[in-house]
Amino acid sequence: TPLKESTCYLPKETGPCVGYFFRYY
């Protein structure tokens, strides 16, 4: 079942934590 988890990554410019990826188990 694919679980949608949130991940934090910092872009080249300073910004908030954004980003998503699907993790399969």
UniProtKB/Swiss-Prot annotation:
Q: Which residues form the BPTI/Kunitz inhibitor domain?
A: 7-25
| Classification via InterPro entries | Kunitz_BPTI_sf
Can you list the GO cellular component terms from the UniProt entry?
extracellular region
The entry's keywords:
Protease inhibitor, Secreted, Serine protease inhibitor
The site (Reactive bond) lies at 18-19
Q: Does Thylakoid show up as a keyword for this record?
A: no
Superkingdom classification of source: Eukaryota
Q: Main localization of the protein?
A: secreted
> What GO terms are given for molecular function?
serine-type endopeptidase inhibitor activity
Indicate where this protein resides in the cell.
Answer: Secreted
Q: What does this protein do?
A: Inhibits trypsin, human plasma kallikrein and human neutrophil elastase.
State the protein's name.
Kunitz-type serine protease inhibitor 4
